[in-house]
Amino acid sequence: MASGISLESILSPQISKVTKTTDNLIITIYGYGGLGKTPVATQMEKPYYLAFGKSGLSGLNNVPFMPVMSWSEFKNLNKILCARKNYEALHQQYHTLILDEMEVLYKYCEEYVASTNNVQKIKDGNGGYGLWGDLKDEWEKEMLRLIGSGFCVVFILHAMANDDGKVMPVGDQKRMLPILLNHSEIIGYVKGNGVNPETGRSIHSSLMLAGTDEYFARTRNEYFDPYIPDFTAENL
């Protein structure tokens, strides 16, 4: 019998409760550029920002961050962040992990899998059949480790319209996105509200939390409103 499991523990289970904190919460937000995704995410509780490629922190002060330029760097960082022995020390300083430009991180993963198999591109490996299974396994292994870390994790992606005109997160629909979207309690589409004609300033974006024919969004919490009119960290 597995350690810690007994008849008594089965008959006296833990009871779930609706969470009132962001502990262990997995959030995916996506949208077109310049709508405030990164500024809002970095206002979450005790943030630690992982920058893939070009940092989105220009114009933002006092945000703890780590530039990550390869999949090997990410794997090493992820191992430290998710190690149980480091949990207490890390959580005293950080509560929210922000992963910006997830499509860039996935590109890192592609390059890593191809390189470790001595080919230029994923499609060239495995005798020309491609390394698609290896890519999916490598990506999901690290994402699952992060998802189970105990942090509030915020994934940030760009948006694109599919062939039907519906706005979706950018990324590989078969291998990259499923592990992120299937484990997210919140998938929010950041929708711009244009400019205030009187002041000439941009109006705060809205966060859409219920999907329509126009865009994809959803939450697992029936108590959430279908959208947040004023998209701020506090309102989220």
Predicted segments, located by residue:
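Charged, amphipathic alpha-helical linker segments immediately N-terminal to NTP-binding catalytic cores
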Residues: 1-4
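Conserved P-loop
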Residues: 8-108
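A general structural signal for short secondary-structure junctions and capping/turn motifs
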Residues: 19, 39-41, 145-147, 177-181, ...
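Short, well-ordered beta-strand core segments
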Residues: 47-49, 153, 186-189
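Single-residue recognition of alpha-helix boundary sites
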Residues: 48, 111-112, 196
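P-loop NTPase motor core
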Residues: 102-179
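Conserved GTP-binding G-domain of TRAFAC-class P-loop NTPases and closely related GTPase folds
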Residues: 161-236
